[in-house]
Amino acid sequence: MVDLKTKAFDISQNFTISLDGPAASGKGTIGLILAKKFSLKYFQSSIVYRQLAFDCISQKIDVTDIDAVIALSKELKLDNNFDLENENIGNIASQIAVISEIRNNLNKYLINLVKTTPRMIMEGRDIGTVVAPDADLKIFITANPQIRAERRYKQLQAKGKTCILDEILRQIILRDKRDKERKAAPLLPASDALIIDTSKLSAMEVVEEVTNYIKNKIT
């Protein structure tokens, strides 16, 4: 049996990391650094939900029309020509993500992606518990809601987007509530996940903690 350290540092080995956590906890930044460090393909699973939200908007489908959204989720195709990162799309994505039929349809896409990619880090809310329960390393990132709101605020400002900190905090708290209370794959760490609170840590400090964990892990 190949140990975790060998899988991580030997690029000829298959190696999968699941990276879960709430909105604006730092997953994206951390995931990209880890992907570069360990030669992994990085994929943000929320993109499939944001793409579906965008498709609903562009095709004028009301998100309360559940049957129509479910049908659309069966035909999902990722299109990189549009900005899927704005808050409106994110909020719609959060609403439709609570619907179990939609999650099941989109998870099929994600599960196949994990299975067909030898070295991957996939970021999301339920990767370690649902999409890739057999991942070699499961990481759960969390942080204080106020800290997360401030991070998102700075990110949006850096992109030149108008935003209000209190509104971002309100939306983060609302998303947390939806994620934790949904019946289909609620947000929670896998039982064997490495849990890291990033409230007082930089992205590089988190990467260092993950790297040390890999080096010292005894399988």
UniProtKB/Swiss-Prot annotation:
EC number: 2.7.4.25
Organism superkingdom: Bacteria
Keywords: ATP-binding, Cytoplasm, Kinase, Nucleotide-binding, Transferase
A biological process term (GO) from this entry: pyrimidine nucleotide metabolic process
EC class of the enzyme, as a word: transferase
Transmembrane segments: none
Single GO MF annotation: dCMP kinase activity
Entry binding sites for ATP: G21, P22, A23, A24, S25, G26, K27, G28, T29
Reactions catalysed according to its record: CMP + ATP = CDP + ADP; dCMP + ATP = dCDP + ADP
Species assigned in the record: Rickettsia africae (strain ESF-5)
Gene (name only): cmk
Name of the featured protein: Cytidylate kinase
Any coiled-coil regions, as ranges: none
Compartment annotation: Cytoplasm
GO-annotated cellular components: cytoplasm
Lineage: Bacteria, Pseudomonadati, Pseudomonadota, Alphaproteobacteria, Rickettsiales
UniProt similarity note: Belongs to the cytidylate kinase family. Type 1 subfamily.
